[in-house]
Amino acid sequence: MHDNTYLPDHFLRHIAAIMPAHLSMDEFVASCRRPLRRSIRVNTLKISVAAFVARMQPLGWQLDPVPWCDTGFWLSREDESVPLGNTAEHLSGLFYIQEASSMLPVTALFACEQTRRDGMLLDAAAAPGSKTTQIAALMNNQGMLVANEYSSSRLKVLSANLQRCGVTNVGMTHFDAKVFGQWLPETFDAILLDAPCSGEGSVRKDEDALRNWSIESIDEIAAVQQGLLESAFHALKPGGVLVYSTCTLSLQENQAVCQSLLDKFGAAFSFDSLADLFPAAEQACTPEGYLHVWPQIFDSEGFFVARLRKHYSVPNTMFKPGKLGKFPFLPLPAKESEPMLREIEAAFGVVPQGNLFGRSEEIWLFPQRFEQVQGKLRFDRIGLKLAETFKKGYRLTHEWALAYGDGASKGFVELGIADAREFMMGRDVWPEQAAGTGEVIVRYQGHTLGMGKWVGSRVKNALPRELVRDNNLFV
């Protein structure tokens, strides 16, 4: 029990006034004081669910399915000597540590047949990346996903999680999400707006989440949310799908925000009922068809999810194209890109998918739909950095290895557990297999740890310094 969880009386009175009649305040308080169950989501860009379960169950991992996400599991481990975030499987991007309720919005987005997996999608408030990587996995790295984050301090962790999970179809931006309705009207096939909120549903992982809670602050946040939702609606194509979600409980930030959009544009869209989204979803369904997940219903965080479909265009008084600086990349000429791609295929048996662009001594792989937003939006990062060039050639990057290394049919070395430990500690290794030449993908149990280079019978370690770990990562 978290007996120190801060639940102020004025907050509890507020909740009691909106709690559905069939739910108990005593159970609500008790659930808020219980530790949150640990949950993870398998990253199917790297491994199938069946293969992940087969790999981890012999290590004493008990995986109980999350009913609303077919790649999500509640987790308990027999051996917790290695912190979950420091396991080799996590660092290789095989799974993402994600609260179970937060898997719901993306499930709702992709449960709609109108959501194009190869289309142009927007995650309007993306960091730290749990839902962004979930979307990218369901897109199978096809199309393009714009991942926007307003907080500059959270961009680095978003980028790191995208690289770790092998995501290649994302362009990262750093704006107040209200600009999308202004700059990119009717551009996106599907949008997730997991809006900034008061976080009332997150007390089980942060006992001080409500330390500064007040009705006044909720009203201020709700006004911001209304502006974000209206802008996202303008950025959505007719026929497109939008999911609005929060990790809070108050009606002002949830139902009332949805109602504000209905009041303005109700004839142009409709909300879907999510009562059949998963077995037992009706337990959290509101009369409007939204999901209002109270923490005691599914023993999870509190969450809210609503899904709408846009039927018609609406007048957009927001439209105002953004001012962009000079784009620092140039398309790589075919005489340079084609030989490079042939060399990569010859060496590793895999062909990077996308368009090659160059900047200074860098070669980048951009998503295939990038041209649809080129010149309309300033990006902090697009796709993945494929290689760094020098006088005598180029050097493939660690992030390329994480994205494509598992699919390589040659040009890789498989390490045993002892050598894998050494490699993740930043040390060179002497594999048992016959030595090769040049760059080599380093794998353990079929999954990529990083890049190395053959020097005689030794593989020289090329792990980025920030990924070197002094402790054992293998159970």
Swiss-Prot record:
- The EC designation for this entry is 2.1.1.178
Instruction: Indicate which residues the UniProt annotation says bind S-adenosyl-L-methionine.
Output: 125-131, 149, 176, 194
**Catalytic site:** 247
A cellular component term, taken from the record's GO annotations: cytoplasm
Q: Name one GO molecular function term.
A: rRNA (cytosine-C5-)-methyltransferase activity
Write down the NCBIfam families for this protein, in alphabetical order.
Answer: nop2p (TIGR00446), PRK11933.1 (NF008898)
Protein role = Specifically methylates the cytosine at position 1407 (m5C1407) of 16S rRNA.
Q: What is this protein called?
A: Ribosomal RNA small subunit methyltransferase F
- Source organism lineage? Bacteria, Pseudomonadati, Pseudomonadota, Gammaproteobacteria, Aeromonadales
